[in-house]
A protein has these predicted regions:
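N-terminal secretory signal peptides that target proteins for export/translocation
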Residues: 1-11
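Short, functionally important structural connectors and interaction interfaces within domains
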Residues: 15-16, 437
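Bacterial N-terminal signal peptides
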Residues: 16-25
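C-terminal His-loop and adjacent cap/lid subdomain of alpha/beta-hydrolase
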Residues: 31-513
Length: 513
């Protein structure tokens, strides 16, 4: 599996290099942009000092534009009447009711698996603005797309979660891997990835002859697996619930499995199945770029709807926590801090408790994954500075390579803790795949580390004998054996929020890293 990922990265590196050259050699025919915004709901918040606008952004991507060359499958994605690839993304704006008081600073928060992101009290007090917009286009669970998302009447869509409607490659098939862990009993069990459904249906849920269900009795993080056998295809079936003897039809996600002998919690069930209709997930990456670019630079959309913050955004900072911070690192690596007119999108970037990337530009990608065995997210460079990948014998590269070429790199603050170092591969970004030396940090990156802390920090209750054990990152992995450290990360996060804001607005250097 790792060899396959390395080959994939080599191919993408070649494509990326060509795209970078093309970026300066070819003028785009048209610009990827948001063509229309629809505000579905407006509410007063913060004692009427702020407004919250909830809506949808309709956008188009030119598949021939070099800025979009890294989007996997964009060349075969369905096109609209303009010959472009279309998307619809959710957005939420929180802005001062009196926009003459707006500070000019916009925080572009990355939704985590479709969820909301709160705005800190000091940001409200400073009259900063907040934008959240959808990027995860797998249309499953917490990122489900409303059925009537393309309705053009304001108010016709009720906001429930963040999403982006991405194109579907109807009729395309391929193999997908799913795993069922820590489950028992005779009832059906779902194919999930970190709590949300695996977003791909089997080609034919009544026929499993193309698929293989394997039992693992043990495995380690470095891929040492003990196989406990293969379940005969006649002893399991796809179902929408029920049992093997009385299965329900598959009509909605999550797809579930029913076993003749039931599930055993001491075993891991690994399914490789023939799936259909993948999403062009990388369109969601470009949507995040373009929605921010619209609210920062546009006066109005093509229908004449005014940009509610037109001319008020002087500085933008993107911020993401955990999965959302990982995708932020991914976007920087792809060069997506430059919009279609060559302008910088965000002056600052803050990946929080995030040390890897997200497979949101792969056919059959599962962006909800947390680097379980065989999950993508660690392929290619994970470090900021250009540096060789010794173990996988890859050429030198870094997350900032593309934005360095276009002079659109943001100022970066990264904050992490012990959980990220020990559980989600963070240390690769510090010392590379051949851990002989620390990789130097570029001048525009500041790193802060909170040793021994859990993912997101503890509750701050400094009891001598904490009772709870730390949870394990993964799909239904349960808890570990070591007690959870109560040390909080709140103070570090609060301090770094102010430090990053000062750094990008006034040039004030952050504390020593």
């Amino acid at each position: 599996m790792s060899m396959q990922l390395d080959v994939t990265y080599r191919k993408r590196s070649i494509v990326a290099a060509l795209a970078s050259v093309a970026l300066f050699a070819v003028a785009p025919v048209s610009q990827a942009r948001v063509t229309r915004i629809i505000v579905d709901a407006t509410a007063s918040i913060q004692n009427n000092t702020f407004q919250q606008l909830t809506g949808r952004a309709f956008g188009e991507l030119d598949p021939t534009d070099p800025h979009n060359a890294l989007i996997t499958d964009i060349q075969i994605a369905p096109r609209n009447a303009n010959g472009n690839v279309a998307y619809v993304a959710s957005f939420v704006l929180r802005i001062p009711s009196d926009m003459t008081q707006a500070s000019g600073v916009m925080w572009h928060d990355v939704p985590n698996r479709g969820g909301d992101v709160g705005f800190p009290a000091d940001s409200f007090a400073a009259n900063d603005m907040q934008l959240l917009s959808g990027w995860q286009g797998d249309n499953a669970g917490g990122t489900a797309v409303p059925a009537n998302v393309t309705c053009l009447t304001p108010g016709c869509v009720t906001f429930k979660n963040h999403y982006v409607q991405t194109p579907v490659l109807t009729g395309v098939t391929g193999q997908v891997l799913g795993r069922i862990i820590n489950r028992s009993g005779m009832g059906a069990q779902p194919l999930l990835v970190q709590g949300n459904p695996i977003p791909y249906f089997p080609k034919d849920w009544t026929d499993n002859s193309h698929d293989t269900l394997t039992i693992h009795t043990s495995e380690t993080v470095n891929g040492n697996v003990t196989v406990g056998g293969v379940v005969a295809n006649g002893d399991w079936k796809y179902c929408g619930g029920g049992t093997f003897a009385a299965p329900l039809p598959v009509t909605a996600l999550p797809v579930q499995l029913c076993l003749r002998s039931g599930f055993d919690a001491t075993k891991l069930y690994q399914l490789v199945y023939l799936a259909k209709d993948p999403y062009v997930l990388g369109v969601g990456n470009a949507a995040f770029r373009d929605v921010q670019s619209f609210f920062r630079y546009a006066t109005a959309d093509d229908a004449g709807t005014a940009n509610p913050v037109a001319g008020k955004v002087t500085t933008a900072i993107e911020r993401g926590v955990s999965q959302s911070g990982n995708i932020l690192r991914t976007w920087i690596f792809y060069g997506l801090n430059e919009d279609e007119q060559g302008r910088i999108v965000h002056e600052g970037a803050w990946p929080i408790i995030a040390g890897r990337r997200v497979p949101n530009d792969s056919r059959w990608g599962q962006p909800d994954g947390v680097l379980e065995l065989y999950q993508m997210g660690s392929e290619g460079p994970q470090w900021w500075h250009s540096y060789p990948d010794q173990l996988r014998n890859l050429h030198p590269g870094g997350l900032l390579d593309r934005c360095n070429v276009s002079n659109t790199c943001p100022k970066v603050i990264e904050t992490n803790g012990g959980s990220e170092a020990y559980a989600v591969h963070l240390t690769v970004s510090w010392v590379g795949t051949d851990p002989k030396n620390d990789i130097p940090l570029p001048q525009n990156v500041r790193r802060y580390y909170l040793p021994s802390s859990t993912h997101g920090g503890g509750d701050g209750k400094m009891t001598e004998h904490p009772t709870a054990t730390a949870s394990c990152p993964g799909n239904n992995y349960g808890n570990g054996t070591l007690l959870a450290n109560p040390v909080p990360s709140t103070a570090l996060v609060n301090r770094m929020r102010l430090a990053l804001r000062d750094w990008v607005t006034s040039g004030t250097e952050p504390p020593p890293r």
